[in-house]
Regions:
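Core alpha/beta nucleotide-donor-binding catalytic domains of modification enzymes
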Residues: 1-117, 121, 126-147
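A structural signal for short hydrophobic beta-strand segments in well-ordered beta-sheet cores
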Residues: 56-58, 188-191
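A short, polar/charged loop-to-alpha-helix boundary motif
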Residues: 123, 169-180
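Short coil-to-beta transition motif at edge beta-strands of beta-rich domains
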Residues: 150, 170-175, 225-227
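Basic, glycine-rich polyanion-binding accessory segments appended to enzymes
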Residues: 184-186, 192-227
Length: 227
């Protein structure tokens, strides 16, 4: 799976940042890699179902398998499972979904897995263990740093208000900008890869009435009609 993971997940991760967007590699991995591999292995072992440790739940609604949030809303992982197909969900069990994380840890200790229960949690992307995606992009894209350095920060009027190290190193909604633009907090509200600019605005500027979406899964519905 290493080659397929590199092409489907890592290459997409890099391409999205270069396109000025922020990717979520876990969604793609679940959709295109993890479930396919697990079910293939399950078929080899003549297993009807697979179980994963995701904090989410599955219910049948109108003949369709629908993902719901786990009982533990703090640890909920339903949002990274939206792309998993109906066929895959029909063979999937989420035993963790009806528990809180603290309950799982107590169960692990009671069953003799105390060291596992006390293991620190990881929030990093699996292929970026140091969680430094900027350095990762620089290693993956030859000459990236030289190409995107000395980009312009713009205000909402399009005026240049400062310099940055490259648009791929920012994400919409980001507040930590490496410099101050006044007394009030500033946020990234726009990224333009074509001219290497990052637009800065207020938190209110992040509020939008229109958004563009793609790769939609309607959950309870197989499709929706226009109008």
């Amino acid at each position: 799976l290493r080659e397929e993971f590199g092409e489907s997940i890592i290459d997409n991760f890099v391409d999205e940042y270069i396109s000025g967007r922020t990717p979520n590699p876990c969604v793609l991995c679940n959709t295109h890699i993890k479930w396919e591999a697990l079910l293939k292995r399950a078929d080899m072992l003549n297993c009807k179902y697979i179980a994963t440790g995701h904090y989410a739940r599955i219910r049948q609604v109108n003949g369709r398998y629908v993902i719901y949030k786990g009982v533990d809303e703090i640890k909920d992982q339903s949002y990274v499972l939206w792309g998993v197909s109906q066929d895959c969900l029909s063979r999937t069990i989420f035993p963790m979904g009806k528990y809180h994380k603290d309950e799982i840890k107590r169960l692990a200790i009671d069953l003799g897995y105390e060291s596992l229960a006390k293991k620190s949690e990881s929030y990093e992307i699996c292929f970026i263990p140091d969680n430094d995606y900027r350095s990762f992009l620089k290693r993956r894209v030859k000459g990236l740093e030289e190409k995107v350095q000395n980009g312009d920060f713009l205000n909402t009027s399009g005026e240049v208000i400062g310099k940055h190290d490259g648009y791929p190193f920012f994400t919409i909604g980001q507040r930590k900008l490496g410099k101050s633009f006044g007394k009030k907090p500033s946020y990234v509200i726009g990224i333009d890869p074509s001219n290497n600019t990052v637009t800065i605005g207020s938190k209110q500027d992040l509020n939008k009435q229109i958004m563009h979406i793609r790769d939609v899964n309607f959950g309870k519905l197989s499709s929706i009609k226009d109008g």
